Amino acid sequence: MFLLYEYDIFWAFLIISSVIPILAFRISGLLAPTSIGPEKLSSYESGIEPMGDAWLQFRIRYYMFALVFVVFDVETIFLYPWALSFDILGVSVFIEALIFVLILVLGLVYAWRKGALEWS
């Protein structure tokens, strides 16, 4: 039988950890002075008057390179706990991790063939 009273501490922690940031934002919004002037509406560029237009276009290669980096960074985050408990988990988890790595290698090969890793 599933007993919910065993999770009282979890629910209390979840509610408190959700209410505290919401209250902090609400209270700071109520207490903070609000004055809108021309200084506040201008763009900020390292303490200097902005030069030119604030709109800059970036090449899509930067985004593709960053996306591939994030994918493999997340892979490292998922594989680290698995590597620490490798001797306890058994063969089935090893096969699942192998499938996970193979899917990521296929993604790397696809990104490589599409030219996402070339910087020229």
Swiss-Prot record:
Membrane topology: Multi-pass membrane protein
Signal peptide positions (record): none
Catalytic activity: a plastoquinone + NADH + (n+1) H(+)(in) = a plastoquinol + NAD(+) + n H(+)(out); a plastoquinone + NADPH + (n+1) H(+)(in) = a plastoquinol + NADP(+) + n H(+)(out)
An example molecular function term from Gene Ontology annotations: NADH dehydrogenase (ubiquinone) activity
GO biological process terms held by the UniProt record: photosynthesis, light reaction
A GO CC annotation given for this chain: NADH dehydrogenase complex
Alphabetic keyword roster: Chloroplast, Membrane, NAD, NADP, Plastid, Plastoquinone, Quinone, Thylakoid, Translocase, Transmembrane, Transmembrane helix, Transport
Enzyme Commission code(s) on record: 7.1.1.-
Tree of life domain: Eukaryota
Coiled coil feature spans: none
Quaternary structure and partners: NDH is composed of at least 16 different subunits, 5 of which are encoded in the nucleus.
Family the UniProt entry places it in: Belongs to the complex I subunit 3 family.
Function statement: NDH shuttles electrons from NAD(P)H:plastoquinone, via FMN and iron-sulfur (Fe-S) centers, to quinones in the photosynthetic chain and possibly in a chloroplast respiratory chain. The immediate electron acceptor for the enzyme in this species is believed to be plastoquinone. Couples the redox reaction to proton translocation, and thus conserves the redox energy in a proton gradient.
Protein name: NAD(P)H-quinone oxidoreductase subunit 3, chloroplastic
Species for this entry: Oenothera biennis (German evening primrose)
